[in-house]
From Swiss-Prot:
UniProt binding sites for [4Fe-4S] cluster 1: 19, 55, 84
InterPro entries: Elp3/MiaA/NifB-like_rSAM (IPR006638), Methylthiotransferase (IPR005839), Methylthiotransferase_CS (IPR020612), Methylthiotransferase_N (IPR013848), Methylthiotransferase_N_sf (IPR038135), NA-bd_OB-fold (IPR012340), Ribosomal_uS12_MeSTrfase_RimO (IPR005840), rSAM (IPR007197)
Catalysed reaction equations from the record: L-aspartate(89)-[ribosomal protein uS12]-hydrogen + (sulfur carrier)-SH + AH2 + 2 S-adenosyl-L-methionine = 3-methylsulfanyl-L-aspartate(89)-[ribosomal protein uS12]-hydrogen + (sulfur carrier)-H + 5'-deoxyadenosine + L-methionine + A + S-adenosyl-L-homocysteine + 2 H(+)
Required cofactor names: [4Fe-4S] cluster
Lineage: Bacteria, Pseudomonadati, Pseudomonadota, Betaproteobacteria, Rhodocyclales
CDD domains the record matches: Radical_SAM (cd01335)
All residue ranges annotated as the MTTase N-terminal domain in the record: 10-120
Subcellular location: Cytoplasm
Enzyme nomenclature, EC number: 2.8.4.4
Taxonomic source organism: Aromatoleum aromaticum (strain DSM 19018 / LMG 30748 / EbN1)
Protein name: Ribosomal protein uS12 methylthiotransferase RimO
One of the record's GO cellular component terms: cytosol
Cofactor binding summary note: Binds 2 [4Fe-4S] clusters. One cluster is coordinated with 3 cysteines and an exchangeable S-adenosyl-L-methionine.
Amino acid sequence: MTQQKSQRVPRVGFVSLGCPKATVDSEHILTRLRAEGYDLSGSYDDADLVVVNTCGFIDAAVEESLDAIGEALAENGKVIVTGCLGAKDDVILAAHPQVLAVTGPHATDAVVKAVHQHLPKPHDPFTDLIPPQGIRLTPAHYAYLKISEGCNHRCSFCIIPSMRGDLVSRPVHDVMREAESLVDSGVKELLVISQDTSAYGVDMKYRTGFWNGRPLKTRLIDLAKALGELGVWVRMHYVYPYPSVDELIPLMAEGKILPYLDVPFQHASPRILKAMKRPGNVENVLERIRKWRSICPDLTIRSTFITGFPGETDEDFEQLLRFLEEAQLDRVGAFAYSPVEGAAANLLADPVPDEVREERRMRLMDFQEDISTQRLERWIGRDITVLVEEVDDEGAVARSGSDAPEVDGLVIIPDGDGLVPGEFAKVRVTDCDVHDLYARPLP
């Protein structure tokens, strides 16, 4: 919840759930409301109404969203619902018919209109209350930079295109203008996100825009080069493994952007990948990983996988483990397959029992632990730059270029009580465990 106190203007509470892309949507809504003079309340009791930005990607997310709506209704009584679950308004209204309004994802205008209807805005706007970078829900030193909306893929387990539509890329000058504003406000790290980051500009046929008086194509490699000129960390997330991704690796080796790729491979059995409607040439993927690391040895690769997908046999799962052994990925997340209403995968034969899905997920994560630890051990004894997150009497917690916020590990600095949150620092790595590095500050 976000808090700003005022006794003279209408107050809106806000609950933001889901992925970083939803966080960006929440920030846009909050910025619009603040610009119109609404105050942002940090409590249900103090708010005149509450907006809940939902997630609907898997069943657990739907349940969490419905619970959050119910809590807001119980504590406040006036609730507007938006976000991915909002695309299924029948589900929301069946559970909570008393909500004031329901909109889908990426619907700032519709949310603001609903707020106007149920809580009329002040007569005069208060644009002076808005910082140039807008309202943000992340710490001051990093920000998510969303470059597109929607997705052109039709992965059989996913319903994102039905909720957020096909790919719509933001004009490159808009992206760069926002990035510059964020950096000017003190942001030290830009996390580039979308549903399909690699496809940026495909829908616009890589149209040429302009930034700082020079032409700039609406294409990921060109955007990455431009962002790399801003003097901050630039981290790439949700990178679909197109061949064009290869172009990013030299930029990472040169230090223009962080040597970090978040690539959701999802599986390694060609048969299961075909059923998922994902690229299925596993040998090609392994060869590309080897090539990436030959160009940029410090590259960190994060990926996610699904266990227990319909039709997955013991041999399919063993293929996945063999892939992990060969690929030596740095960071891995795994999800037991969960049927999502409306997903094509629901119609596939041979569903895997729930307990087997979860058992395979746990086996995969246990298998990956040794690999992740070995990948971290290579940093011991090296001097690295970290971005400090928190400092207290017991020391500091930071992140390295290999660690995205909330999903990866940390750098623990026991003697770091003199460091400054939100600033870069030089440290020497002294030890590691499965997820985290340990370090001491350098003079």
